[in-house]
Amino acid sequence: MSGITLTKLTQERISIPNNNVITNGVENNIDSDTLSGTLTHLMEEHRTRVGAVTGPEAATTSTDGLISNGAERLRLQGSRLQTSRFACFRCCGNIITYLVRLRSTPEELEQRYKSKEIDKFLEKEKHTFRRQVKLLLLGAGESGKSTFLKQMRIIHGVNFDYELLLEYQSVIYQNVIRGMQVLLDAREKLNIAWGSDGREQDAYDAKLMECNSLDVPKFMEYAPPISRLWQDRGIRRAFERRREFQISDSVSYFLDEIQRLATPDYVPTHKDILHCRKATKGVYEFCVKVQNIPFVFVDVGGQRTQRQKWTRCFDSSVTSIIFLVSSSEFDQVLAEDRKTNRLEESKNIFDTIVNNATFKGISIILFLNKTDLLEQKVCNPETDIRWYYPHFNGNPHSVLDVQNFILQMFMSVRRSSSISRIYHHFTTAIDTRNINVVFNSVKDTILQRNLNALMLQ
């Protein structure tokens, strides 16, 4: 055995001492340099591994079946590599199989590459998911959730593409037409007289205006009568009594800007986009990286019919909840039932969220929104919060007193000390500077509270 050298395996029968042969199953294209070696060395190596001792019994061990059925079994059981080569021989009563892998087909290389890429992607996604911050935007309808989300796009430099700008343009035109139609209807129901003669024809024309699929030429045709109506004292008086009916807060902004909106080259500005109103239906997500951490904002509709969809977003991946309240709506009722106070509705929803065991350990950030509109109402001598909340003890025309009253009303719903701390901010969602300052504070709070979970250094 000591003098036997295995230099090349071919399909030819190769004679070795003791009439043992190497046969079958080995192709001619095997590189002789790759497979060069001494059979004695291979067998001695195996004896060392299994703890066998050399001796007469070992010396008589047969080496027949050097290429045996073991190769075929291995080929059938696990090998999909058509160019793999197997060399098997018997030593110490055991079958030793050597697998020599010479090359792979292009298909196999492509499969292995794809598999590695998938593994890398999954690992990266797993790492990103662990690090992401997921924020739920909750609150009653028209509380400013979608406006806050628009601000996140603007603040973080995510541009509105052309198709989206066209969509906002159409929504803005609809806001103007429907807003004027609501004011015309309210003027009649409230028995408010026209401020000047000759407005009946303009009113008639406005009521017949089509809101859907408005383009610039059509809106330019509608703009003159709408502008004349908005200048009428009767329509202005109806708008001042808007708490008595349902109308969007932004109608006055667009009616004041109607001449600019009715130009041939009109493109919505950021301010226009922030003021336009379209009810959110379903669930909408927006992701932006903040300090290399993915912040995922989830916006869901706040109307009663949409709140059943909130539960889809309640899972263990939620980092914080931002709850928005329209603080100026203490004198308004819901559009859904025309009797429930809007501020009370928001407080009841907040109560449900804060005391829900699902959110134990999750920070809750309360945005008392629409501070600008609250200031207008509080400073108006014709409005008094005590008409709606008789137990209010402060100055009804002090913005600070009214804000503190509303804040305590919401903070008082917390029934368990085990609930996470509630943070609060007074906000104006249409004010980019205000939201930027507030979000920086919120961001720092969230990152600090979740330092370990986010694996930051």
Curated annotation (Swiss-Prot):
CDD domains: G-alpha (cd00066)
Residue ranges, annotated region (G1 motif): 134-147
Domain G-alpha: residue ranges: 131-457
Alphabetical list of Gene3D superfamilies matching this protein: GI Alpha 1, domain 2-like (1.10.400.10), P-loop containing nucleotide triphosphate hydrolases (3.40.50.300)
UniProt record, GO biological process: actin-mediated cell contraction; adenylate cyclase-modulating G protein-coupled receptor signaling pathway; apical constriction involved in gastrulation; convergent extension involved in gastrulation; establishment or maintenance of cytoskeleton polarity involved in gastrulation; G protein-coupled receptor signaling pathway; gastrulation involving germ band extension; mesectoderm development
Molecular function terms, GO-annotated: D5 dopamine receptor binding; G protein activity; G-protein beta/gamma-subunit complex binding; GTP binding; GTPase activity; GTPase regulator activity; metal ion binding
Compartments it resides in: Cytoplasm
Residues that coordinate or bind GTP: 139-146, 274-280, 299-303, 369-372, 429
One GO CC term, this protein: cytoplasm
Purpose of the protein: May play a role in a signal transduction pathway used during gastrulation. Required specifically for the ventral furrow and posterior midgut invaginations, where it is necessary for coordinating cell shape changes.
Assembly with partners or alone: G proteins are composed of 3 units; alpha, beta and gamma. The alpha chain contains the guanine nucleotide binding site.
Protein name: Guanine nucleotide-binding protein subunit alpha homolog
